[in-house]
Every structure is written in structure tokens, then in C-alpha cells.
């Protein structure tokens, strides 16, 4: 088994995800490619509608690890939302805002699959004290341009706390292999951030291990992988 380490971290928009130290926040546009649209939004008594089938079901004050920058630092009273995707579309990246009696809160989220739910924290760590929500606005929406997959026919991906192993199941070399993962909680995905870990080129039949500081055996989930041939 070969062992490689990679380090990095970010969650922004050149359009998409996030990566962190050998499990770095994936940068927008670094995944499978996407097209970006900008839209407005409406609100109703049932919640906040960002787009058809895309809604905020709850706004609340969050306490726990701050996941959006990959640090996991303790935080409390941070503005957070429950985001729900009831469409048939997989979204690679989105940015949105909510306006409350106390001001505007900004959010970024990535890898929101069809039918999925996600808890997203204010990207500026803004505090929330229960102020009434007036409206919401969708700033950026970018669907995946190809269906995300973990490639179970060509890759065998396993992980433990802090490490990911990838085996090439094919008869040829796979180049620029990346694995993307997210944290989970009882609601669904925890954090808009998506982590990315690179493995370089993997020869036929070989297994490569890479450190991924933010992956946890019991609370993380690999959401997709990517490579070139």
C-alpha cells in the first residue's frame, strides 16, 4: 500500500465545494463542472422558498463545531438554516441570503443532492438571537453538469478516522483521482462544506492511502469521486 499526504483548505465560489488538510474543502468548479444561474426568491408561511423545490425549512441558533471552514472550532449562537432539496436536480453549489429584523445573513452550500437535507451555518459566523425572518434570496445556483457518482465499478473506497484508501479496480491507470465527502448528523448533511482529498495517479490494482483530517468513520459520508483516464 502506498501512502501519500496532501494538505489544503477552502470553501468559496469560483463556483463550488470545499476541501481540508488532506481532506480539504473543495473549491467551486473543482468537481465535475457546473453552470451558474442567479435568481431571486419568495417566502411563504410554510418556510422560505429559494426556487421551485428548494427551500429553507428552519432558521435557528446553532452550537457545536463550526464546520464551514473545516476548522471544527467550537461555536455557539451561530445563525443556521435547514435546507431541503425536493427537486430531481443535484446541485453542485449555491449561495443564498436571508434577511431578518437584525440584518442579512449569507450562506454557501455544496453537493446538495436531489431529495437531500442539509444544515448550513452562516459563512461569516454571524450570531442569531431569534429575530424574525423577513425574506430570502438565492444568489447563485449551479447544478452538476454530470451525475456525481462514487464509481463503485472502478474504485473501492474505504476510510477510517483521518485516512481514506482508494483501490483501482480497473486494468489501466486512473489519473488525478479525488474523493469528496461530507459530515452527517441526524437531520442529513452537516455543513455546506464538501471536503476533497487527492490521490494522484493510481496504477491498475494498486491501493493508495491519503490522510484526510476531517473524515470520521462514524459521521462522514463519501458523496462522489472523480478521475481521468
Positions of the model-derived regions?
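Bacterial N-terminal signal peptides that target proteins for export
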Residues: 1-10
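C-terminal motif of bacterial Sec signal peptides marking the signal peptidase cleavage site
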Residues: 17-21
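Bacterial lipoprotein signal-peptidase II cleavage site
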Residues: 22-30
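Terminal connector regions
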Residues: 44, 124-163, 214-229
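Short, solvent-exposed loop/turn segments enriched in Ser/Thr/Gly
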Residues: 73-80, 158-163
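Asparagine-centered strand-capping/turn motif at beta-strand->loop junctions
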Residues: 82-88, 165-171
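Short acidic, flexible loop segments centered on an aromatic residue
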Residues: 88-103, 172-189
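Intrinsically disordered, low-complexity Pro/Gly/Ser/Thr-rich segments with frequent PxxP/GP/PP motifs
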Residues: 103-129, 189-217
Amino acid at each position: 500500500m502506498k501512502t501519500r499526504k496532501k494538505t489544503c483548505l477552502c470553501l468559496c465560489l469560483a463556483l463550488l465545494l470545499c476541501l481540508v488538510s488532506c481532506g480539504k474543502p473543495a473549491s467551486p468548479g473543482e468537481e465535475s463542472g457546473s453552470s451558474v444561474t442567479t435568481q431571486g426568491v419568495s417566502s411563504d408561511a410554510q418556510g422560505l422558498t429559494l426556487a421551485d423545490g428548494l427551500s429553507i425549512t428552519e432558521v435557528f441558533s446553532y452550537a457545536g463545531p463550526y464546520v464551514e471552514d473545516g476548522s471544527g472550532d467550537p461555536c455557539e449562537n451561530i445563525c443556521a438554516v435547514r435546507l431541503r432539496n425536493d427537486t430531481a436536480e443535484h446541485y453542485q453549489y449555491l449561495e443564498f441570503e436571508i434577511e431578518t429584523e437584525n440584518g442579512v445573513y449569507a450562506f454557501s452550500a455544496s453537493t446538495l443532492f436531489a431529495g437531500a437535507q442539509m444544515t448550513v451555518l452562516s459563512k461569516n459566523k454571524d450570531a442569531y438571537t431569534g429575530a424574525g425572518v423577513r425574506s430570502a434570496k438565492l444568489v447563485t445556483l449551479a447544478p452538476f453538469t454530470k451525475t456525481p457518482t462514487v464509481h463503485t465499478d472502478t474504485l473501492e473506497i474505504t476510510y477510517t478516522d483521518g485516512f481514506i484508501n482508494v483501490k483501482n479496480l480497473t486494468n489501466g491507470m486512473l489519473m488525478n483521482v479525488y474523493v469528496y465527502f461530507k459530515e452527517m448528523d441526524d437531520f442529513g448533511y452537516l455543513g455546506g462544506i464538501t471536503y476533497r482529498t487527492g490521490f494522484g495517479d493510481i496504477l491498475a490494482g494498486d491501493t493508495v492511502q491519503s490522510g484526510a483530517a476531517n473524515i470520521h468513520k462514524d459521521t462522514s459520508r463519501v458523496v462522489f469521486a472523480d478521475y481521468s483516464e
